[in-house]
Amino acid sequence: AIWKQLRALEALGLEIESVKGFGYRPPDSFELLSKATILNHIAESHGDLPCELEIFQSIDSTNRYARERAEAEAISGTVVLAENQTAGRGRLGKTWVSPFAANLYMSIVWNFDQGAESLQGLSLAVGVGVRRTLVELGLQDVQLKWPNDIYIGGKKLGGILLEMIGDPNGRCTVIIGIGLNVAMPSLA
């Protein structure tokens, strides 16, 4: 029944509008991630990259899942995206509020051969890359705040969470988590 589907969407935090005489509709700013669109954009702008892309409607944490994939020998460059996280995490174990289809929740698996010492400054390098991308997309006044925050116009836009697994003195894998508050609802 339609009401079960509506309840399932509401359970994800998506407000469904009832339009008398017409039915139901999602909010106007509703847009889901598209694997085909993302892969086409990557191919057009960077050529074919040897990466794997996984998109979830809902997941507990993209970083947790990416970590599991890395422990199962995922290829370097594996990207995990989600429309919703039920247990998103920020730095120092803080909760990362992750409403459905409102923001960007992404984790990247990346392998390094030189160990933890060679990773000094990685958080800053990732932040610079995110900032550069946002500026290329037309955003202005994008700033980085040490150690992992991204701001626009003095307001927090997102954050970066790095987690390392493997040998601190040799081959290791870093899970690079990036969360961006694209369309954060005012109640979140």
Enumerate the predicted regions with their spans.
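N-terminal lobe of the biotin/lipoate ligase/transferase fold
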Residues: 3-136
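Solvent-exposed beta-strand sheet faces enriched in polar/charged residues
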Residues: 17-19, 145, 163
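Hydrophobic residue at the +6 position relative to the catalytic HRD Asp in the kinase catalytic loop
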Residues: 24, 149-151
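Long, positively charged amphipathic alpha-helical accessory segments at protein N-termini or as interdomain linkers
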Residues: 1, 7, 11-12, 114-142, ...
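Short flexible/disordered coil segments
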Residues: 89-91, 141-147
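Active-site glycine-centered loops adjacent to acidic/histidine catalytic or metal-binding residues
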Residues: 88, 149, 179
